């Protein structure tokens, strides 16, 4: 089964360019002020990051080959916003639990996005069935979520605290301490076991299936490089770059053939209303904190969390329709 994926060479070049270019600048970025490190997040508000979910309400029509109709579109948009409002309510009532839930959901979702990319690029010959694809998603999603926690626990805790403080400043320290109570060594061990299991399973498949050796090598090359990327670079920078140039771009490459006939310009135009609406809502709810670098990123991430809930539902539905986890 051929899965749609636009801009294969250009998209890969841009993603890898962002990762390798950042690694080359690691000594400079290590001492960079916070105002510089948050620049990828500023960029994400208008390009690749936030816009990658802005056309979600159009996806069901495109995938079913239906004409866009105002009534169903309005209903989908209202449901989308209602689910986002429920997420914000969770951040108000139980901010620490909401932060943990958001991190776990992002782990699953970013892994989900990379599994689609592996399949669409034809890099999946070593992934033999649903269980191994789920493990691939767990490994890929762990890289941006778990490696920074193990390598930079203080910064990770500061960002989680800033997220909790976005709506409940009195809960910030509790959320921060929750992160600091996790021993970094245990995170490294858990990640090591996960990656080792994935590598061994892939090697067994590659041993039996010669065509899988190349794809396993490509997959593990990305896993190794991304591990170094998140371990060596400041998390504010690395996760922001990944959000834009890796995850966001790959999802847009998935959407372009479905929604915009492969046209980047048309897809960008379709994303404008949703992006502006999302920015307006984030600005309205978090106007007092967005101007502060770390606090602003925390507030922005809570806004993204509200959108991530319904976005994951849409992407999961796409996965089922396209048989990402079950098809050959």
Locate each region found by the language model.
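N-terminal signal-anchor module of multipass membrane proteins
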Residues: 1-51, 301-307, 312, 316-321, ...
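Predominantly late transmembrane helices and immediately cytosolic-facing juxtamembrane segments
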Residues: 113-119, 242-259
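Membrane helical hairpin/interfacial module
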Residues: 32-95
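Hydrophobic alpha-helical transmembrane segments
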Residues: 175-197
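Membrane-interfacial helical/loop segments at transmembrane boundaries in membrane proteins
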Residues: 157-182
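A cytosolic-side transmembrane-helix exit/cap motif
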Residues: 58-66, 116-133, 257-268, 316-325
């Amino acid at each position: 089964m051929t899965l749609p994926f636009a801009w294969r060479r250009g998209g890969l070049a841009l993603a890898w360019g962002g990762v390798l270019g950042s690694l080359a600048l690691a000594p400079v970025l290590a001492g960079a002020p916070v105002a510089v490190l948050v620049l990828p997040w500023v960029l994400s508000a208008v390009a690749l990051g936030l816009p990658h979910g802005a056309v979600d309400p159009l996806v069901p029509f495109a995938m079913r080959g239906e004409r866009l109709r105002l009534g169903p579109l309005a209903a989908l948009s209202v449901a989308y916003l209602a689910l986002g409002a429920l997420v914000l309510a969770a951040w108000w009532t139980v901010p620490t639990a909401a932060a943990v839930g958001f991190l776990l959901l992002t782990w699953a979702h970013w892994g989900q996005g990379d599994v689609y990319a592996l399949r669409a690029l034809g890099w999946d010959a070593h992934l033999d069935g649903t269980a191994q694809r789920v493990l691939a998603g767990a490994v890929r999603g762990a890289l941006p979520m778990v490696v920074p926690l193990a390598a930079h626990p203080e910064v990770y805790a500061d960002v989680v605290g800033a997220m909790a403080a976005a709506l409940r400043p009195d809960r910030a320290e509790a959320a921060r301490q929750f992160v600091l109570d996790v021993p970094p060594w245990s995170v490294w061990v858990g990640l090591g076991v996960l990656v080792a299991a994935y590598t061994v399973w892939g090697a067994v498949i590659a041993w039996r299936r010669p065509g899988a050796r190349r794809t396993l090598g490509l997959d593990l090359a990305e896993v190794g490089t991304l591990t170094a990327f998140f371990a060596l670079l400041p998390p504010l920078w690395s996760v922001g770059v990944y959000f834009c140039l890796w995850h966001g771009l790959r999802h847009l490459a998935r959407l372009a053939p479905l929604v915009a006939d492969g046209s980047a310009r048309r897809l960008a135009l379709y994303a404008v209303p949703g992006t502006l609406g999302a920015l307006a809502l984030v600005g309205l709810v978090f106007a007092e904190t967005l101007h502060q670098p770390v606090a602003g990123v925390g507030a922005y991430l809570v806004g993204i969390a509200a959108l991530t809930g319904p976005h994951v539902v849409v992407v999961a539905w796409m996965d089922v329709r396209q048989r990402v986890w079950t098809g050959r």
